[in-house]
Amino acid sequence: MRTIFLGLAVGIGVAALGVAVSGQTQARQQGGGRTEPPTLEQMRRTVASLKGNRIATPNDYDTLTSEQQAYVRSILTGPRASITGPLGVMMVSPTLGDLSQRAMAYARFAGDPGFSIVPPKLNELAILVVAKHWSAEYVWNAHHSYGVRVGLTPAVVEAIRTGTRPAAMEQDVEAVYNFATEFIATRSVSDATLQAAKLALGGDRGVVDLVGTMGLYQISSMMVALDRTPLGAGTKPFFQR
């Protein structure tokens, strides 16, 4: 719980400071990166495509409140350029959703100017550890392939999926893996684990950014768990094999 609350505090603080959501480099790599405001028709189509499972996500743009419409516009103008998973769930609470999606963009597009300074490889490692902890199929599906694309080995990703310690890790990967798994398991980190993480992440800010990412993705995992958001058609579960 400490991780969740610290992550939320970091995220809301970032959003309150008005961190610019530009992240175009990684956004393009991940299928996003809109550079112009969405049209009314694009917003209507996006909302019409939403389908909550246990949470009644609205799917008629013309019935949205002004806050919900602003939430849709903000996401579609940002680096994601789409509303999926936890962002759809949070449509029912648009103020929380908007604060969260801005902070989550700060975390997700790590490495781009104005965003988290955590190297993308290590950022994705922490996200996958959180997804495994929560058995968050939706979050895992959104990140496991990208983790490999930014430098994690398939063996490390597969070990996290199966809940085993990776047999061989680079020094920075091992430091962040130890930090993330120890923090989640014990709600604390030893001095030695913290110091190793600081070396891997470039100091205090890197560690704080990493914990913010972990907290924010615990929120994401909880939202999709609340809704029991399904995987796409034809996608097999990752944690029930």
Predicted features by range, described:
Residues 18-29:
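Signal peptide processing junction and immediate N-terminal pro/mature segment
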Residues 7-18:
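Bacterial N-terminal signal peptides
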Residues 27-117, 241:
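Mobile cap/lid helix-loop segments that border enzyme active or cofactor-binding sites
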Residues 1-4:
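Positively charged n-region of N-terminal signal peptides that target proteins for export
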Residues 117-126, 209:
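Alpha-helical scaffolds flanking conserved acidic
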Residues 198-199, 206, 215, 223-241:
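Acidic, carboxylate-rich catalytic segments that either coordinate divalent cations
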Residues 170-211:
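Acidic/histidine-rich alpha-helical segments that form the ligand environment
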Residues 122-160:
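Mid-length scaffold segments of soluble, non-membrane domains
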